[in-house]
């Protein structure tokens, strides 16, 4: 379990919130100085997501998506708005959501709702979303809160809806990052927590062409 790395839950969440308050509301800020990987990231995410949006009896709809840990809307703008009629955004940092309204431009009119909230306290509206996208943010949740959040996300899905997690993982034990107060989980633990939440993994994909110094990034699709 990775929660043993969290000695004080209140401090764990408070420190992360303070960290993000001091991060510039830019793409480079959202990516911790790795803004140059954004195109590679988004292109891979689009290919991964589109396999579920194609024709077929289990096809995922394109009515509404939710961007979790949305920041200024990097993923909303380049990945979700081009594919979905409406996108909702949730982030713990109010300044980022305010910036999103200008960053998203004209297409931002199709953002349905902005939620300023930590994911540990957020409950998606039942049966609203075709896709719930959770990228580079599960490390800011304890194991217990991640499981309960995924359970709430499951209730938020429309028929044939899917939840997608994209995040850094390790292969040999979870690691705490004291700088931003987050946990990089072992990939086996991520799979275990997904199962604990009552979800089934549909596909897993490793991100290619990222800098060597970054922990490996994997995408998980589930319902």
Curated annotation (Swiss-Prot):
This is N-terminal Xaa-Pro-Lys N-methyltransferase 1-B. It is found in: Nucleus. Keywords: Methyltransferase, Nucleus, S-adenosyl-L-methionine, Transferase. Pfam families: Methyltransf_PK. S-adenosyl-L-methionine binds at residues 69, 74, 91-93, 119-120, 135. InterPro entries: MeTrfase_NTM1, SAM-dependent_MTases_sf. Belongs to the methyltransferase superfamily. NTM1 family. The gene is ntmt1-b. It is an enzyme of class 2 (transferase). One of its GO terms (molecular function) is protein methyltransferase activity. The keyword Transferase applies. The lineage of its organism: Eukaryota, Metazoa, Chordata, Craniata, Vertebrata. It comes from Xenopus laevis. Distributive alpha-N-methyltransferase that methylates the N-terminus of target proteins containing the N-terminal motif [Ala/Gly/Pro/Ser]-Pro-Lys when the initiator Met is cleaved. Specifically catalyzes mono-, di- or tri-methylation of the exposed alpha-amino group of the Ala, Gly or Ser residue in the [Ala/Gly/Ser]-Pro-Lys motif and mono- or di-methylation of Pro in the Pro-Pro-Lys motif. Required during mitosis for normal bipolar spindle formation and chromosome segregation via its action on target proteins. It catalyses: N-terminal L-alanyl-L-prolyl-L-lysyl-[protein] + 3 S-adenosyl-L-methionine = N-terminal N,N,N-trimethyl-L-alanyl-L-prolyl-L-lysyl-[protein] + 3 S-adenosyl-L-homocysteine + 3 H(+); N-terminal L-seryl-L-prolyl-L-lysyl-[protein] + 3 S-adenosyl-L-methionine = N-terminal N,N,N-trimethyl-L-seryl-L-prolyl-L-lysyl-[protein] + 3 S-adenosyl-L-homocysteine + 3 H(+); N-terminal L-prolyl-L-prolyl-L-lysyl-[protein] + 2 S-adenosyl-L-methionine = N-terminal N,N-dimethyl-L-prolyl-L-prolyl-L-lysyl-[protein] + 2 S-adenosyl-L-homocysteine + 2 H(+). Its EC number is 2.1.1.244. GO terms for biological process: chromosome segregation; N-terminal peptidyl-glycine methylation; N-terminal peptidyl-proline dimethylation; N-terminal peptidyl-serine dimethylation; N-terminal peptidyl-serine trimethylation; spindle organization. One of its GO terms (cellular component) is nucleus.
């Amino acid at each position: 379990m990775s929660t043993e790395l969290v000695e004080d839950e209140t401090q764990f969440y408070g420190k992360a919130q303070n960290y993000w308050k001091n991060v510039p509301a830019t793409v480079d800020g959202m990516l911790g100085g790795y803004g140059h990987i954004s195109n590679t990231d988004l292109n891979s995410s689009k290919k991964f997501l589109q396999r579920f949006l194609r024709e077929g009896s289990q096809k995922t709809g394109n009515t509404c998506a939710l961007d979790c840990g949305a920041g200024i809307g990097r993923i909303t703008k380049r990945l979700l708005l081009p594919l979905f009629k409406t996108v909702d955004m949730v982030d713990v940092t109010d300044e980022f959501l305010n910036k999103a309204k200008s960053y998203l431009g004209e297409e931002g009119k199709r953002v349905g709702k902005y939620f300023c909230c930590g994911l540990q306290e957020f409950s998606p509206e039942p049966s609203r979303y075709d896709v719930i996208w959770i990228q580079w943010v599960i490390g800011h949740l304890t194991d217990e809160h991640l499981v309960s959040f995924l359970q709430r996300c499951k209730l938020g899905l429309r028929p044939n809806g899917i939840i997608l997690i994209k995040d850094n993982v390790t292969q040999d034990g979870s690691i705490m990052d004291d700088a931003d107060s987050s946990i990089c989980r072992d990939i086996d633990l991520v799979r275990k927590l997904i199962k604990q939440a009552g979800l089934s993994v549909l596909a897993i994909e490793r991100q290619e062409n990222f800098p060597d110094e970054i922990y490996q990034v994997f995408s998980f699709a589930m319902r």
